[in-house]
């Protein structure tokens, strides 16, 4: 058992009024337990309602006593993780999206599953985060964090892009493809998995490089130590190309641009029910390793 949480900060999925019933249910449940409860400032501004709760920003939250509960889907949880990574505030995800692979609970489970967590009966893990910088003509023009993946990709046309990749200053390959995913272990069950990459356990100290539709039969996904610095240079493109971080932004690229990716010094801190394990989630949500003939 660890220290019980002293306050809860609620975060909602942005631009989605359908989360309001779930937020009200969470608010009522927490207040009935005399738990000091706040609504994240941007969430309140987005839904246009404070739900009668005091507002608190991520910057004002306390990593030593506060719990962030993010209500939404995986996108909400990823955005919350980027916001809290520097401070180390723990996050619990409650799914109100579709699959919700990263969110441990559904809104219907809170009465049973949430009290033990609030009282300190939980497990936690630190998830690595990627730091990406976009350099153009020796000038840094963009920087950001990614919990799942850094994605370098072609625009809307049919032509591939060409990328040259180096690792710690050593040449890895030059490939023509629709794109390149550099994923964390957390991101290995997202886009990288759909593109044929392997699944990594969440706390493994590794990164994945997965090409999207490469024009070759031999460039397989690559797992490397997360201590390396990866530099991907856009060497050719007949159309637009872009850089995306967790799919939440898209930055246009130009020929000669370099994207420098390394593990960030901060990490995402996720909270889970005590009885949960990663392989249970894989089986339950992705039907991983199902035996033939089983339901």
From Swiss-Prot:
GO biological process: NAD metabolic process; NADP biosynthetic process
GO cellular component: cytoplasm
Pfam families: NAD_kinase, NAD_kinase_C
The organism of origin for this protein: Acidithiobacillus ferrooxidans (strain ATCC 23270 / DSM 14882 / CIP 104768 / NCIMB 8455)
Active site: 74
Function statement: Involved in the regulation of the intracellular balance of NAD and NADP, and is a key enzyme in the biosynthesis of NADP. Catalyzes specifically the phosphorylation on 2'-hydroxyl of the adenosine moiety of NAD to yield NADP.
EC number: 2.7.1.23
Signal peptide segment: none
Family per similarity comment: Belongs to the NAD kinase family.
Alphabetically ordered keywords of this record: ATP-binding, Cytoplasm, Kinase, NAD, NADP, Nucleotide-binding, Transferase
Main location: cytoplasm
Subcellular location: Cytoplasm
Catalytic activity: NAD(+) + ATP = ADP + NADP(+) + H(+)
Gene name tied to this protein: nadK
Cofactor(s) required for function per UniProt: a divalent metal cation
Protein's name according to its UniProt entry: NAD kinase
Keyword rRNA processing found: no
Gene Ontology molecular functions: ATP binding; metal ion binding; NAD binding; NAD+ kinase activity
